[in-house]
C-alpha cells in the first residue's frame, strides 16, 4: 500500500529472482491433471477460496454458459500440461476473469494432504487419493 514499501519489495524480489505478476480479479480455480500427453485426464475444477468443487452458478446464471466456461477451464489446464510436457500429474492454477481463463501457475508436485486441492479434486472425481498414489508409484 505504501509506495516506498512497494519499491523496496520489488528491489528485494530482483535480488532473489522472485516473480511478480499482475493481480487478476476473478474466480480462482485449481485443476488437477492425471496422466501424460493426449492420454491425460482433467479432474473437476476446485474453487480455491472454498476448497470445494467449482459451483456452476458462480460461473454464470445460465447452466449452458456455466458448462461452457467449465469446459474452457478444463481445456486450458489440459493444454498447459501438454505444452509444458508435464508427466503423470500436476495441479494447474487458473483464474476465470469473467471473459477468459488466465493461467496463474502450475504445481508439478502438489500437496496430496487431506483437504488439499488435489485430494479434493480426486474425491470429487470419485477417486481415492490412496488409489491415485498407488497408481503413480507403479508408473
Can you annotate each of these PLM segments?
Residues 1-4, 127:
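Short coil/turn linker and secondary-structure boundary residues
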Residues 3-75, 80, 96, 101-102:
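Phosphate-binding site of ATP-dependent enzymes
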Residues 64-139:
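ATP-dependent carboxylate activation and anion-phosphoryl transfer catalytic cores
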Amino acid at each position: 500500500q505504501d509506495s516506498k514499501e512497494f519499491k523496496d519489495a520489488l528491489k528485494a524480489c530482483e535480488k532473489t529472482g522472485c516473480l511478480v505478476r499482475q493481480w487478476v480479479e476473478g474466480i480462482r480455480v485449481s485443476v488437477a491433471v492425471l496422466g501424460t500427453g493426449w492420454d491425460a485426464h482433467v479432474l473437476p475444477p476446485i474453487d480455491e477460496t472454498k476448497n470445494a468443487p467449482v459451483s456452476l452458478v458462480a460461473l454464470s446464471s445460465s447452466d449452458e454458459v456455466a458448462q461452457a466456461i467449465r469446459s474452457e477451464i478444463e481445456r486450458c489446464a489440459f493444454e498447459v500440461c501438454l505444452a509444458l510436457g508435464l508427466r503423470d500429474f500436476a495441479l494447474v492454477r487458473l483464474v476465470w476473469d469473467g471473459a477468459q481463463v488466465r493461467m496463474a501457475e502450475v504445481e508439478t508436485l502438489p500437496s496430496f494432504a487431506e483437504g488439499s486441492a488435489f485430494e479434493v479434486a480426486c474425491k470429487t472425481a470419485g477417486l481415492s487419493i490412496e488409489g491415485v498414489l498407488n497408481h503413480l508409484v507403479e508408473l
